[in-house]
């Protein structure tokens, strides 16, 4: 399992490095998102490298809407208001008003005109008066923090440009088939081969950044006495990409090569704090603490996540392993990376992992942590019954 997960990580690193080399040369790559999102591929290039020929290729072969991904600071500098204030689109794609260069264009729609508009918008000294509104180029606001905050091609294109050492702005265009349908992965593989392009996913960029960037930093340390379980050292960690504060609770001496009893736990309001009978999160957390108390050493990492208010009371996932609303594989991948960085900061390398979910093992091993043993936690009957009623049975390690 470890070899497979590490190979996946190695493949992602290699793919992103190939893509960055292409981006630096002013070439395009194909960036796919997750099957849980739009399940599509976009042509992507660095905005500062755009040419009329590139825009024409996107219009001719991509066939989708040609957009300009910009960071929030650039959007503010150019004084570009959002297209709508109440965004009700499925994936909260943040369109601003459309734009046109104030000078140097004719009708604005030609490949040359659109390339010129993009060049004007991303120029280092660009100002609001350089652009007319509306126009034929559609800017998108990328979230600060890139794919580690929002897992879309908008953020992916900006991350690729930034990681390539270029201005953080990208030009993207959805790829459609000749018959007008959206190109899915099999179509995108053929397209990439035909046009000799690198094909990578947003998940590849997430893995690359989690491997190459330090995203958490230790910001505090204190002693904590748990009722009936003695003393723990509590370490708090801040995030460089959002406002989340994570906590690691350490008992005993965790140094050395012996595997350490470890629980990586997603914080859950309903289960951990409110004690819902329909959620086993609190029970799983207490079991983890009890196991660590009995062993005399171990670590519990509690990961905070900014869950939308409307979803906070919908968390009826079993044993802290099931999905909460909007919790896709890319979100889990990001959590695994943050959890792994915290464990590495504590000096851990080999784990006895308290989990019922094999995905957690694969996820943590992707970041060079060895899971020497999986220790399952028991489930109460009520959450199991509720989850079973919601979805068809499937194989699961319990």
Residue ranges of each PLM-predicted region?
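Catalytic domains of riboflavin
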Residues: 1-398
């Amino acid at each position: 399992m470890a070899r497979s997960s590490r190979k996946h990580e190695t493949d992602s690193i290699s793919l992103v490095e190939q893509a960055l080399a292409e981006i630096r040369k002013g070439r395009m790559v194909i960036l796919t998102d997750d099957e849980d999102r739009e399940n599509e591929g976009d042509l992507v290039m660095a905005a500062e490298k755009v040419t009329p020929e590139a825009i024409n290729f996107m219009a001719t072969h991509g066939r989708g809407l040609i957009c300009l991904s910009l960071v929030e600071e650039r959007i503010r500098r150019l004084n570009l208001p959002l297209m709508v204030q109440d965004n009700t689109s499925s994936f909260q794609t943040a369109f601003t008003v459309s734009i046109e260069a104030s000078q140097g264009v004719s009708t604005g729609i030609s490949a040359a005109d659109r390339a010129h508009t993009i060049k004007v918008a991303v120029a280092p000294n660009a100002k609001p008066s350089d652009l007319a509104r509306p126009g034929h180029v559609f800017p998108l606001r990328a979230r600060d923090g890139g794919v580690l905050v929002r897992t879309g091609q908008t953020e992916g294109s900006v991350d690729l440009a930034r990681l390539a050492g270029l201005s953080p702005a990208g030009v993207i265009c959805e790829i459609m088939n000749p018959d007008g349908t959206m190109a899915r992965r099999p179509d995108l593989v053929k397209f990439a081969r035909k046009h000799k392009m690198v094909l990578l996913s947003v998940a590849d960029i997430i893995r690359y950044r989690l491997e190459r960037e330090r995203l958490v930093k230790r910001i505090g340390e204190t002693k904590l006495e748990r009722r009936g379980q003695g003393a723990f050292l509590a370490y708090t960690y801040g995030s460089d990409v959002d406002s989340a504060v994570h906590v690691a609770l350490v008992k005993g001496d965790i140094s050395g090569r012996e595997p350490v009893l470890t629980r990586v736990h997603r914080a859950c309001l309903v289960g951990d704090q409110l004690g819902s009978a329909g959620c086993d999160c609190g029970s799983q957390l207490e079991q983890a603490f009890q196991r660590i108390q009995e062993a005399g050493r171990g670590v519990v990492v509690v990961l905070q996540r900014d869950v939308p208010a409307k979803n906070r009371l919908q968390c009826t996932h079993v044993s802290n392993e099931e999905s909460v609303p909007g919790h896709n594989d890319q979100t889990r991948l990001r959590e695994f990376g943050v959890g792994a960085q915290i464990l590495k900061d504590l000096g851990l390398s080999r784990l006895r992992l308290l989990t019922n979910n094999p995905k957690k093992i694969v996820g943590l091993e992707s970041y060079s942590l060895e899971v020497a043993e999986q220790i399952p936690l028991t489930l109460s009957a009520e959450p199991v019954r509720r989850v079973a009623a919601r979805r068809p049975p499937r194989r699961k390690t319990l």
